[in-house]
């Protein structure tokens, strides 16, 4: 197979790891902290996870760090372990380094250890479709993007027959542990599997690894999910390139939609990196109950003011999930989903788009109908055409950036007639998503993911189940990073999914009181009127650490001065 010169060089990159993980794993001890609860719905979750709820936080420490008030558990006698890994959900840069870290950790623990990769995501767990990951295989994928070593998938393990199939697979393969690499839904699956295995007397432990470029799987113990750093650096390069083009041509407004359906972390991080004229934050729209008309008017005011200064160009960042945070649009989508769930067969029986449109207008309430009819035809058609297997609107397929362009164009024409706008408006729409999911991981993600793999190995060695690997102190030097495990139930609450209450890991949305948003909100008025673009350039892998190794702006603002010892949840000495 032919590979690029960069890939050849990246194969040689040796990820930096915390000092704790450099030595003999037999010298690494587990220190249990305080028992945990959940985000909310404690009683319901305690009932559903009777065997794994309330487990303590875990910190891994050197055997020399003795503390009588917080005793340590030494590592068991080394033996060969059989561990499997599955990649679940969408791709994120660094997944192959999680596999590499887990593989290297297992071989360091005992030469007879075996790492197995389930193929095609959770479906591979159900079918037993797998490969053994040997040194040659993993070496060919070190520090590379993508999940193509074993593939990924979006199958959810949720029915009784699926749990039984998973149990049969891990039992037949005599697995000591199953490592699930995924986002909130995938790690929710991991928690359910861990509980099921314990209840069934199956010894296989289940361990999660936090993955999502969206950045919405985090809390005090999980400082960031892997892939966010690389993806936002990749998008920011593209935004910077477009901003430079806009500043050169001086005649286009670029509306750029960015991945992030549930949270606006990607848009916010890219805004902090590139300083666009406008960046919409979905969480702020919801908090202020801003209507579509208000958002459009705000955009038009910025465009008109810049035009007065001869600047008929600009950059607007739009989070992918914005449309679901606009109150009247959220109500419309909710009603559409309910109507389609109840009367899907009636809708599907109609043989023309016009007939479907008339039918849906009659089925909607008066308020929802008014919103639906006010939308541009191409957008309302998308609401009806793009639906998931449950009949729900697929929000990610709605061209929100096009919706804004169409509405802004219409409103600016009205403002011209009113005499409040005298400029020229030309627009271009973009969507950046897949461009960032499989990039070569940044040095930060390469180091972080490799460390996550080593940490998952330690959790398997020490026989923990129902935990997600945690690496902290991420704004310190890598040598000072701290590692451990967080009970998955600690991240959970109950939410309504497809008509019933389900246990799920709660998504971390943009905190409007947090430092990243506060810094953004202080500066955005200036960026709106004064062209202040920053051009980050491509992700750098070689050169000064300030250029190559810096983590995201978000995490640096959230955690500017980590404590020297950030062990969490354990009894103080």
From Swiss-Prot:
CDD domains: Pyrophosphate_PFK (cd00765). This is Pyrophosphate--fructose 6-phosphate 1-phosphotransferase. Its EC number is 2.7.1.90. It comes from Treponema pallidum (strain Nichols). Catalyzes the phosphorylation of D-fructose 6-phosphate, the first committing step of glycolysis. Uses inorganic phosphate (PPi) as phosphoryl donor instead of ATP like common ATP-dependent phosphofructokinases (ATP-PFKs), which renders the reaction reversible, and can thus function both in glycolysis and gluconeogenesis. Consistently, PPi-PFK can replace the enzymes of both the forward (ATP-PFK) and reverse (fructose-bisphosphatase (FBPase)) reactions. InterPro entries: ATP_PFK (IPR022953), PfpB_PPi_PFK (IPR011183), Phosphofructokinase_dom (IPR000023), PKF_sf (IPR035966). Belongs to the phosphofructokinase type A (PFKA) family. PPi-dependent PFK group II subfamily. Clade 'Long' sub-subfamily. The keyword Protein transport does not apply. Diphosphate binds at residue 90. Its cofactor is Mg(2+). Mg(2+) binds at residue 184. It catalyses: beta-D-fructose 6-phosphate + diphosphate = beta-D-fructose 1,6-bisphosphate + phosphate + H(+). Homodimer. It is an enzyme of class 2 (transferase). SUPFAM superfamilies: Phosphofructokinase. The record marks 211 as: Important for catalytic activity. Keywords: Cytoplasm, Glycolysis, Kinase, Magnesium, Metal-binding, Transferase.
């Amino acid at each position: 197979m032919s590979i690029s010169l960069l890939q050849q060089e990246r194969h040689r990159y040796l990820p930096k790891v915390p000092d704790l993980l450099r030595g003999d794993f037999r010298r690494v001890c587990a220190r249990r902290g305080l028992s945990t609860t959940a985000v909310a719905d404690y009683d319901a979750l305690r009932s559903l996870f009777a065997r794994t709820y309330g487990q303590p936080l875990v910190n891994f420490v050197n055997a020399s760090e003795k503390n009588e008030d917080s005793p340590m558990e030494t590592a068991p006698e080394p033996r060969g372990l059989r561990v499997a890994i599955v990649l679940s959900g969408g791709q994120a840069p660094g997944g192959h380094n999680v596999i590499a870290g887990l593989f290297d950790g297992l071989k360091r623990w005992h030469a007879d250890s075996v790492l197995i990769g389930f193929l095609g995501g959770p479906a591979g767990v159900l079918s037993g479709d797998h490969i053994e990951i040997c040194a040659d295989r993993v070496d060919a994928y070190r520090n590379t993007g993508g999940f193509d070593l074993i593939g990924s998938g979006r199958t959810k393990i949720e029915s009784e027959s699926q749990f039984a199939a998973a149990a049969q697979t891990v039992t037949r393969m005599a697995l000591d542990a199953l490592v699930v690499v995924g986002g909130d839904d995938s790690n929710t699956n991991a928690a359910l599997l861990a509980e099921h295995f314990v209840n069934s007397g199956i010894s296989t432990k289940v361990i999660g690894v936090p993955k999502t470029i969206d950045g919405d799987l985090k809390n005090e113990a999980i400082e960031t999910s892997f892939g966010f750093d690389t993806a936002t650096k990749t998008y920011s390069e593209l935004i910077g390139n477009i901003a430079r083009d806009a500043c050169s041509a001086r005649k286009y407004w670029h509306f750029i939609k960015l991945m992030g359906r549930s949270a606006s972390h990607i848009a916010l991080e890219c805004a902090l990196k590139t300083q666009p004229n406008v960046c919409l934050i979905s969480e702020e729209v919801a908090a202020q109950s801003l209507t579509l008309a208000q958002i459009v008017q705000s955009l038009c005011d910025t465009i008109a003011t810049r035009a007065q200064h001869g600047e008929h160009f600009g950059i607007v960042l739009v989070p992918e999930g914005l449309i679901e945070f606009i109150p009247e649009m959220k109500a419309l989508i909710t009603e559409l989903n309910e109507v389609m769930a109840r009367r899907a067969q009636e809708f599907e029986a109609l043989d023309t788009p016009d007939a479907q449109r008339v039918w849906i207008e009659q089925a909607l309430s008066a308020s929802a109908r008014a919103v639906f009819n006010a939308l541009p035809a191409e957008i309302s058609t998308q609401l009806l055409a793009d639906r998931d297997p449950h009949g729900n609107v697929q929000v990610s397929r709605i061209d929100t950036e096009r919706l804004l362009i169409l509405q802004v164009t219409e409103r600016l024409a009205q403002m011209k007639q009113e005499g409040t706008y005298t400029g020229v408006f030309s627009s271009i729409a973009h969507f950046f998503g897949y461009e960032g999911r499989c990039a070569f991981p940044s040095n930060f993600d390469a180091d972080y993911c490799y460390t996550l793999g080593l940490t998952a190995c330690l959790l398997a060695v020490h026989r923990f189940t129902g935990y997600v690997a945690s690496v902290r102190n991420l704004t310190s030097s890598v040598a000072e990073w701290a590692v451990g495990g967080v009970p998955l139930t600690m991240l959970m609450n109950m939410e309504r999914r497809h008509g019933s209450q389900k246990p799920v890991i709660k998504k971390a949305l943009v905190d409007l009181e947090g430092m990243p948003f506060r810094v953004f909100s202080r500066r955005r008025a200036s960026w709106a009127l004064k062209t202040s673009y920053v051009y980050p350039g491509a992700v750098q892998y070689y050169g000064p650490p300030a250029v190559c190794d810096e983590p995201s702006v978000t995490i640096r603002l959230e955690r500017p001065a980590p404590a020297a010892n950030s062990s969490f949840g354990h009894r103080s000495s």
